[in-house]
Swiss-Prot record:
Lineage summary: Eukaryota, Viridiplantae, Streptophyta, Embryophyta, Tracheophyta
Pathway membership: Nucleotide-sugar biosynthesis; UDP-alpha-D-xylose biosynthesis; UDP-alpha-D-xylose from UDP-alpha-D-glucuronate: step 1/1
Keyword Lyase: yes
One GO CC annotation: Golgi cisterna membrane
Main location: Golgi
Cytoplasmic topological domain: 1-48
UniProt protein name: UDP-glucuronic acid decarboxylase 1
Species whose genome carries this gene: Arabidopsis thaliana
Keyword Translocase: no
Enzyme Commission code(s) on record: 4.1.1.35
Length: 435
């Protein structure tokens, strides 16, 4: 037995790797290299969960970045994946400029010109409305990702239903008087009832949307570094004493009248926008929009063009308030959309008039509607409404010079396009009522 014990001890000693004679520590027996596979096997078996989590992280990073990588070169793609994985491991998120650098656009949300234009993520408040839905069509058509925020107070899902299957379109039912957190490059803030019928129906809601809604959207723009465009209105000029109206004109507005919830609300929104620009460095654009018409207008929203067209199609008299000598200028909606996009992409801060300088009295407009729809249509006169501006015509010299923009579609060219849309909708409405 002693002989066997000596043999086994001798065998273990042969496998022992002696340490240096000068070491102050007692020698330890090291495992033979042949035992390493057993250690790796133990590691893989006992730490499977860790390896699974790392694999999921790497795979998720690849699939998230896949749309961006498809537009980048091979070297740039590899660099982007490496940066993203390193951020995930160190738990330190990249700044916005990390992914915007070299891709165009940057933190300001400006759209670069050229084939390799960076796809932007854009939010449009009030995007289910008349103007908003046409703007969304434009942005989707050029390849951007668009998020529409609307509470459907005046907006209609029918204006956007053709985009529901588009992967670059998203619709959120939300009221802008409440904050919302999104990551976007540009903000088009259109949310607010623009028709007298709607904003007089709920004046408190109207001014809250103008003030609180604008505050929330400006706060979002500040947090994420987005460029912000406010759609203001020619109503900020009130009943003007200057004709035509330039952007430098301060206006003549009744601050306590029936229309003031909208007029003064928009003036306050402009003030907030410029204060955020001066105080917080937010890039703001202000579009003072004059009378606009076109498809998707509400059939009975009280605005003069939609009123005249709907009344004539239904064989009702056209309602003219006052003597009919008030003047307005009318721009087609596609011209306005082009102006909004040009303003957003331009580097000029501050207000711009966007409108058609062609001026018509209400009686002249009624005659054009009769020419297009029904020469036998009649006119009915009613007392004028309170605070109705007598004249309204934009001076668009600034937009021409700095934005290279001016309207292209005349009233006689654009009105038939609107009439076609109104005929179809009124016909469908009558069929739904069984008329």
């Amino acid at each position: 037995m002693k002989q066997l014990h000596k043999q086994m001890s001798s065998k273990r000693d042969e496998e022992t790797i002696p340490m240096s004679q000068s070491s102050p520590y007692s020698p330890k027996t090291l495992k033979h290299p042949r035992s390493l596979p057993r250690s790796l096997h133990y590691l893989f078996r006992e730490q499977r969960l860790l390896f699974i989590l790392v694999g999921i992280l790497i795979g998720s990073t690849f699939f998230i970045l896949q749309p961006s990588l498809s537009r980048l070169g091979a070297a740039e793609s590899t660099s982007l994946i490496t940066r993203s994985v390193s951020y995930a491991v160190t738990d330190s998120p990249p700044s916005r400029s990390t992914f915007n650098s070299g891709g165009g656009g940057g933190r300001t949300g400006r759209v670069p010109v050229g084939i390799g234009r960076k796809r932007l993520r854009i939010v449009v408040t009030g995007g289910a409305g008349f103007v908003g839905s046409h703007l969304v069509d434009k942005l989707i058509g050029r390849g951007d990702e668009v998020i529409v925020i609307d509470n459907f107070f005046t907006g209609r899902k029918e204006n956007l239903v053709h985009l529901f299957s588009n992967p670059r379109f998203e619709l959120i039912r939300h009221d802008v008087v409440e904050p919302i957190l999104l990551e976007v490059d540009q903000i088009y803030h259109l949310a607010c009832p623009a028709s007298p019928v709607h904003y007089k129906y709920n004046p408190v809601k109207t001014i809250k949307t103008n003030v609180m809604g604008t505050l929330n959207m400006l706060g979002l723009a500040k947090r994420v570094g987005a460029r912000f465009l406010l759609t203001s209105t020619s109503e900020v000029y009130g009943d003007p004493l200057e004709h035509p109206q330039k952007e430098t004109y301060w206006g003549n507005v009744n601050p306590i009248g029936e229309r003031s919830c909208y007029d003064e609300g928009k003036r306050t929104a402009e003030t907030l926008a410029m204060d955020y620009h001066r105080g917080a460095g937010v890039e703001v654009r202000i579009a003072r929009i004059f009378n606009t018409y076109g498809p998707r207008m509400c059939l009975d929203d009280g605005r003069v063009v939609s009123n005249f067209v709907a009344q004539t199609i239904r064989k009702h008299p056209m309602t003219v308030y006052g003597d009919g000598k008030q003047t307005r200028s009318f721009q087609y909606v596609s011209d306005l959309v082009e102006g909004l996009v040009a303003l957003m992409e331009n580097d000029h801060v501050g207000p711009f008039n966007l409108g058609n300088p062609g001026e018509f009295t209400m009686l002249e407009l009624a005659e054009v509607v009769k020419e297009v729809i029904d020469p036998s249509a009649t006119i009915e006169f009613k007392p004028n409404t309170a605070d109705d501006p007598h004249k309204r015509k934009p001076d668009i010299s600034k937009a021409k010079e700095q934005l290279n923009w001016e309207p292209k579609i005349s009233l006689r060219e654009g009105l038939p396009r609107m009439v076609s849309d109104f005929r179809n909708r009124i016909l469908n409405e009558d069929e739904g009522k069984g008329l």
